[in-house]
Amino acid sequence: MHRNLAVSYLICLAPLLASLTVVMPNSVVAQQELPAAEKIDFNRARELFQKRQKGEKLTDDEDAYLRKAIAARRGSDGPAPAAPAPREKTGLIPLSDMTADDRYQGEDGGLYGAGRNAPPATHENAARVELSQIRPLNAAGEPAETGRVVFISISMSNATQEFSRFKQLADADSAKSDLLTIVDCAQGGQAMAEWAPADARPWTVAEQTLARAGVTSRQVQVAWIKLANKGPRGTLKEHGRKLEQDTTAVIQNAKSRFPNLRIAYLSSRIYGGYAVNALNPEPYAYESAFVARWLIQNQVKGDAALNYSAEKGPIKAPLLLWGPYLWADGTSPRKSDQLIYTRGDLAGDGTHPSDAGRTKVARLMVDFFKTDPLSKTWFTRQALPNR
């Protein structure tokens, strides 16, 4: 195959092969109908695809196996749904503007539910306890006057585009603590499903990124996680439960990889109504906020899978809070702050932020972390305990 054609072939197949992980419910269902000898090991297929991406030559048998996996994956998933026509607004109400009486597919309003945009008192008190433990740590994770408080991002391309600009603005802001090191660990193409396996490559890349920044995994105490999966389908209950499952795994992995992680701030996507593809259009971008809320509500209710307190059993997760809520209904101003997204805030695909959009989101993030009553305790200039 001509080199250019081969490259084009891989580029076209990248989204498909990126989904070839061990956890593949649709493919598992499809394989149940195949004879045992014809079942596909999608983990092996993914390894072969990554081998080819590195420029290594596949044997004839390996190449045939990879093509067979691609065909099986296509057959189990079917064609991706088309994106709706781009539009300036949808008529959907931002979750932070919804009241306790408003309903969307049975869900009421408020970031924390019941029309509330602040955490319940018990959860806020628990958050303050966790926040009181944030202090400068050395490379071994021990308190030290010369240590660092590390704040990372975990998610996909939109997140790294936004968080990298946030880092630029925050590092230049005189309000930011000198003890805080911000590291962008989010990675293009790596949505929640890609981070969900405990041994997934994004975790290795994240640790390499930390090393390049001169810090370690034991110094990470705060994370920002942006919720999204690629090509969601179906109703909120259908695609939302998959995103909930994947993000729960991501949160657990983060706590395991970063043992001193105290707080994880969750955010949903920006407006997706200008999308020209099915990567994450509306209403999926809007609906990801409900999944973030489900996770926090699960933790508030005592879900053992998201337990953060040693008093309640094995610790599985950091404490969860809302980070900045980034969605607004296109050109329809959000009540709380008049936030809008114009077509110019999005790149050509209508899904990723443009340079102006990156800056808009980054400013929202800086404003949130330095003014929120809970986050400003570690984000802004003030004496953090060294004990």
Model-derived segments and spans:
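Sec-exported extracytoplasmic/periplasmic mature domains
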Residues: 50-57, 67-75, 167-171, 175, ...
